[in-house]
Design a protein with these regions (language model features):
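Positively charged n-region of N-terminal signal peptides that target proteins for export
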Residues: 1-4
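Bacterial N-terminal signal peptides
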Residues: 7-16
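Long terminal segments
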Residues: 20-73, 125-183
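Amphipathic N-proximal alpha-helical interface segments
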Residues: 71-93
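Aromatic-rich beta-strand edge motifs centered on tyrosine
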Residues: 76-82, 105-110, 131-138
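A short glycine-rich beta-turn/N-cap micro-motif
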Residues: 84-89, 111-114, 137-143
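Mid-length scaffold segments of soluble, non-membrane domains
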Residues: 88-116
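Beta-turn initiation residues at beta-strand->coil junctions
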Residues: 92-96, 118-122, 145-147
């Protein structure tokens, strides 16, 4: 009896892990398809199915006191259908300050919630310092990696929250620019 219970529990655990990784795999596939779609937009011109809003802070590269070189450029890729409000699908931000560069990419579901967030912090010379990936389903984190290595649940809370906050800030920025900031 105990052996069959143990086998059943082990089977359920394996099934749950497989289902979760399948969801992560689906998010990866969706992200790759979306990036392919975005890459094709310039060739599609007015027949493209997405729009792109670009916010470029300090494009002339002026220096900030105490910081030095600073620039932030964000591309928001979104859909519009009829009279419905725009739906953000992907935000891509490059932020340079002093000798550091942070690139953030966030993919959103149809309800405006982040489903995948990638954050890469590098030095100006291009040397990677930290890469973080967060996979979400609704409000639940499915997986979080640091430099392509899974991070144990108990150790990832603050880093995972920081990555999620970047994606949340980007969607709020988009809604603010598009006139939907109170949602």
């Amino acid at each position: 009896m105990r052996k069959s219970t143990l086998v059943a529990l082990l089977s359920l655990a394996i099934l749950a892990a497989f289902a979760q990784s399948k969801t992560v795999e689906q998010i990866r596939a969706d992200y790759n398809a979306l990036k392919t779609e975005v890459a094709r937009l310039p060739q599609m011109k007015e027949t493209g199915i997405m729009y792109c809003l670009i916010v470029d802070d300090n494009p002339q590269g002026a220096t900030y006191p105490g910081i030095g070189h600073f620039r932030s450029k964000t591309h928001f890729y979104y859909d519009v259908a009829g009279d419905e409000p725009p739906v953000l699908r992907l935000a891509v931000e490059s932020y340079e300050s002093g000798t550091q560069r942070t690139d953030t990419e966030a993919m959103y579901d149809e309800r405006g919630r982040a489903s995948f967030v990638f954050v890469s912090q590098r030095t100006v010379e291009g040397q990677p310092v930290v890469e973080q990936r967060l996979y979400m389903e609704g409000d639940s984190a499915l997986d979080f990696t640091l430099n392509k290595i899974g991070v144990a649940e108990g150790l990832r809370a603050q880093s995972q929250r920081d990555v999620w906050m970047k994606a949340n800030r980007l969607v709020k920025q988009f809604l603010s620019v598009m006139g939907g900031g109170d949602e």
